[in-house]
Amino acid sequence: MSERRTTAQSPDRSSAGSVRRLLAMAGIGGAFAAALIGPGTAAAQAESCPDVEVVFARGTAEPAGPGRVGQAFISDLQNSLNGQSVGVYAVNYPASYDFLQSAPQGAGDASAHVQSVAASCPDTSIVLGGYSQGAAVVDLITADPAATFGFGQPMPPAVADHVAAVAVFGNPSDKIGRPLSAISPLYGAKTVDLCNGADPVCSNGDDRAAHSLYVQTGLTDQAADFVAARISAAPESAPMVDASDTVG
């Protein structure tokens, strides 16, 4: 079940120690199915698919939903997309301080949802995002398996064609020199991985306040511009993902 799933029409744009310690800081194939359900139902499904689907994982201890950073990023992105419809899925997970239990739960939920959207809405551009622990959730489903700290359900490679961009903020893996843009062979080139100044969660700095200032420093808007450009440059359609291969 989703924590939050909404679709909105965006307005026109008005202006252009140890890894454990570190982390604690922070079945029918799609084509065959379409043939069975018939063109009328398939068309109805296509009409219900948003142009863009944002899948966002909130930070530790934030209330259910995309979180403060996630909501700001989504709003900035809607303003950048010139009228394209935007669906929002808030990753359903505890976001608790028990990181090694919480983050893998989020990764499993996010992976299942992304695969479902890729199979049922192949023309939808998927955007992955996360803040703080939520950024680590995104790391788990997109990174090289060797970097996933025991999580064993990375998304199938074919799903990458459906993901237009990835935006993460305050990512704990940055602190150990492994930003998502560097550790993900399939998603690295389409990723913006932002650390706010001396944020100690993602850098060797000690400015704790910086971890709470991603909206105020304009980094959500910067990420939205990057993602909007990636969506504009994406091909019109991606290969069909076989629904029998999805998780969920």
Regions found by a protein language model. Give the residues of each.
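Secretory targeting and sorting signals
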Residues: 1-44
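Active-site catalytic motif of lipid deacylating hydrolases and related acyltransferases
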Residues: 47-125, 197-246
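Extracytoplasmic/secreted cell-surface and envelope-processing proteins
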Residues: 63-66, 98-99, 137-139, 149-150, ...
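Active-site catalytic pocket residues across diverse enzymes, especially alpha/beta-hydrolases
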Residues: 81, 145-149
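Gly/Ala-rich beta-loop-alpha elbow adjacent to hydrolase catalytic centers
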Residues: 128-134, 138
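A conserved short beta-strand
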Residues: 151-170
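Active-site nucleophile loop of the alpha/beta-hydrolase fold
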Residues: 167-174, 196-198
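Surface-exposed loop and adjacent secondary-structure segments within mature catalytic domains
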Residues: 181-200
